[in-house]
């Protein structure tokens, strides 16, 4: 990369001000190597910039050298553990389509229905829609691995979270 003066490593924290930091997250899965960034204010997580790893109501595909297993680990360890109030800033907006995917598997999901109405007709290029980790827990199928309705849709009752995640990722590839 021309003019590169510094590289970043997973776990590194960059001080932005006396009260603001940026934590570098290792987030493989969408690609072999991927970094995301978590902002902290006085040590409290505020927002996460997820690139193509976590989308509003979805996750990234693994077509560019990534691994569904690595993506599962990243979502489970890096994002699912964040507090509800953390805002999510993905690299792209596929919210309406991803909500439709959730509803194809979990038609009774009222949060997904409500958000789909909310974003109908919204141009994400002009009016970005921001969700939180708490929102994602209510309508992102990849955060709802224990949903009986999703498990039944995949014919995976009593499967492990990993098995449900991998089946969701495979289904989303062809949906």
Each language-model region and where it sits:
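Catalytic core of the metallo-beta-lactamase
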Residues: 4-104
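Accessory terminal helices/loops
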Residues: 73-87, 94-175
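Short hydrophobic/aromatic-enriched beta-strand-loop microsegments
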Residues: 1, 49, 109-113
């Amino acid at each position: 990369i021309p003019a590169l003066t510094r590289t970043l490593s997973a776990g590194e924290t960059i001080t932005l001000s006396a009260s603001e930091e940026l934590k570098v997250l290792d987030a493989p899965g969408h690609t072999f190597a991927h970094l995301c960034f978590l902002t902290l204010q006085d040590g409290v997580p505020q927002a996460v910039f997820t690139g193509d790893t976590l989308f509003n109501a979805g996750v990234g595909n693994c077509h560019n050298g990534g691994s569904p297993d690595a993506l599962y680990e990243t979502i489970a360890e890096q994002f699912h553990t964040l507090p509800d109030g953390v805002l999510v800033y993905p690299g792209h907006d596929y919210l309406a389509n991803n909500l439709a995917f959730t509803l194809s598997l979990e038609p009774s999901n009222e949060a997904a229905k409500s958000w789909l109405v909310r974003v109908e007709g919204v141009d994400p290029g002009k009016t970005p829609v921001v969700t939180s980790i708490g929102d994602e827990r209510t309508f992102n199928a990849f955060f709802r691995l224990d949903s009986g309705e999703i498990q039944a849709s995949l014919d995976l009752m009593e499967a492990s979270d990993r098995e449900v995640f991998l089946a969701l990722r495979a289904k989303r590839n062809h949906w």
